[in-house]
């Protein structure tokens, strides 16, 4: 906002800065929108929050009910809930160090990345993650409420990242910082 960044660009960075600008820390911070409720020990709980927060923020809808069942007041049904979730299913979260400090308390940036584009989304019967419906194939589909032309399967394609997008410690600035830290310890 302080840089007079357009809302469209802000949203793009919140959802996909890891692919749009994989080496730009100032833009990568925006993916914190997707990591703010990260649950290390329950991925499904975290993805429920991602689906809910993106729907509230960008569609003006609450999707709590349709995770478990079709609801007469929600414009999306249970299948559409899981189709929306399928857009986020490949995501994982990691912490990229901001300095050469190896301690666990060192400053780091929380960011998302696509770990596995082939991961399958499962519909959980009555929203129970212990009861997935193995018969249904769930694809990433834009909800019908956006019109017939929008309600189609979205292509999810791999984006080739530079090596430092995967391994930020190899970036020239990170290597220089590590060399400086080693030199300080040696002196």
Regions found by a protein language model. Name each.
Residues 82-187:
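Substrate/cofactor-recognition hotspot
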């Amino acid at each position: 906002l302080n840089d007079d960044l357009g809302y469209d660009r802000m949203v793009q960075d919140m959802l996909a800065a890891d692919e749009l600008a994989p080496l730009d820390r100032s833009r990568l911070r925006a993916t914190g929108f997707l990591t703010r409720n990260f649950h290390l020990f329950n991925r499904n709980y975290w993805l429920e929050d991602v689906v809910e927060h993106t729907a509230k923020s960008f569609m003006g809808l609450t999707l709590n009910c349709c995770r478990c069942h079709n609801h007469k007041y929600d414009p999306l049904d249970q299948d559409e809930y899981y189709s929306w979730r399928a857009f986020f299913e490949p995501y994982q979260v990691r912490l990229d160090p901001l300095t050469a400090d190896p301690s666990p308390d060192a400053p780091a940036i929380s960011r998302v990345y696509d770990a596995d584009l082939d991961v399958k989304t499962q519909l959980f019967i009555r929203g129970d993650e212990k009861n997935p419906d193995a018969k249904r194939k769930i694809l990433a589909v834009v909800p019908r409420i956006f019109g017939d032309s929008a309600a189609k399967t979205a292509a999810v394609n791999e984006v080739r990242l530079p090596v430092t997008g995967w391994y930020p410690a190899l970036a020239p600035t990170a290597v220089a910082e590590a060399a400086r830290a080693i030199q300080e310890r040696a002196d």
